[in-house]
Amino acid sequence: MKNNYLANLIKTLQAIVVSVALLAPLVLPSAVNAFPVYAQQAYENPREATGRIVCANCHLAQKPVEIEVPQGVLPDTVFEAKVEIPYDLSVKQVTGDGTKGPLNVGAVLILPEGFTLAPKDRLTPEMKEKTKGVVISPYSDSKKSIFVVGPIPGAEHQTIIFPILAPNPADNKNVHFIKYPVFVGANRGRGQVNPTGDKSNNTLYSSPVEGRLTKIEKTEKGGYILTIQSKSGDPLTINVPVGPELVVKEGQKVTADQALTVDPNVGGFGQTETEIVLQSPARVKGLIAFFFTVILAQILLVLKKKQFEKVQLAEMNF
């Protein structure tokens, strides 16, 4: 009897766990259907062979992004990669339900093989304060030198700090003391295209054909169903979700590619790159010794010149 009770209890708990997992995307759409989850699920590598970061496939507007890293770092040292995502904090974006809300931001940092997130016990108190409330994770198990963050509130995180641990060539034979490229992509606001290829409600809707707008029907959710009679006589239906505002009226003639709504998008995506040098401690010490030798030689040369001038002056007086 007791065994049957335990078995039933285990089955019930398993059913609850499965139900929660299935309902999570519905209860938390902003967390699931947001950058960078789309990219992680759809692309093995976020940077295409052309150099373009795949986030640009959904975030169509171009916006600036900046990255700052040290010019050179030593092996097994922690440094900051600072990503700047500037935008006007006064603007509001169209959310999934059509209302206006604040923008969120996200970023993907692509580092060379061997560079990893710095362990918490290696962070300084200042670094811990800068990264407080920001969850940074590897892109995937096979891409541990690519890091993603977001979506997070943009108002508090226009600057994102990535604490990075530099690799040591002595421990990793694939790492060398050379100059490496660093790539970054960052977005602010929602995308215009879903991974399925469908438009979101944060983009402009236009007429695919030339004709006449014969009917505008408002839906229960607040969107519109537009019926366009093409020049060939065939009716065409366009679904406009809640969010974009119409700029056309019923009975109006429209041309191909003519805007039917305003463009509600206020965000966008940007990418840039920089370089970082993994410095050899022996080379740095050798360079310091070389500079010290040069400076010492210059000092000795000046002293020798002064001594020679004094001897010449003494001989002239004699």
UniProtKB/Swiss-Prot annotation:
It is found in: Plastid, Chloroplast thylakoid membrane. Its cofactor is heme. Pfam families: Apocytochr_F_C, Apocytochr_F_N. SUPFAM superfamilies: Cytochrome f subunit of the cytochrome b6f complex, transmembrane anchor (SSF103431), Cytochrome f, large domain (SSF49441), Rudiment single hybrid motif (SSF51246). One of its GO terms (cellular component) is chloroplast thylakoid membrane. Its main location: plastid. Gene3D superfamilies: 2.40.50.100, Cytochrome f large domain, Single helix bin. Heme binds at F35, C55, C58, H59. The keyword Heme applies. One of its GO terms (molecular function) is electron transfer activity. Binds 1 heme group covalently. It is a single-pass membrane protein. Residues 1-34 form the signal peptide. Keywords: Chloroplast, Electron transport, Heme, Iron, Membrane, Metal-binding, Photosynthesis, Plastid, Signal, Thylakoid, Transmembrane, Transmembrane helix, Transport. The chain crosses the membrane at residues 284-304. The keyword Glycosyltransferase does not apply. The 4 large subunits of the cytochrome b6-f complex are cytochrome b6, subunit IV (17 kDa polypeptide, petD), cytochrome f and the Rieske protein, while the 4 small subunits are PetG, PetL, PetM and PetN. The complex functions as a dimer. Belongs to the cytochrome f family. This is Cytochrome f. It comes from Rhodomonas salina. The lineage of its organism: Eukaryota, Cryptophyceae, Pyrenomonadales, Pyrenomonadaceae, Rhodomonas. The gene is petA.
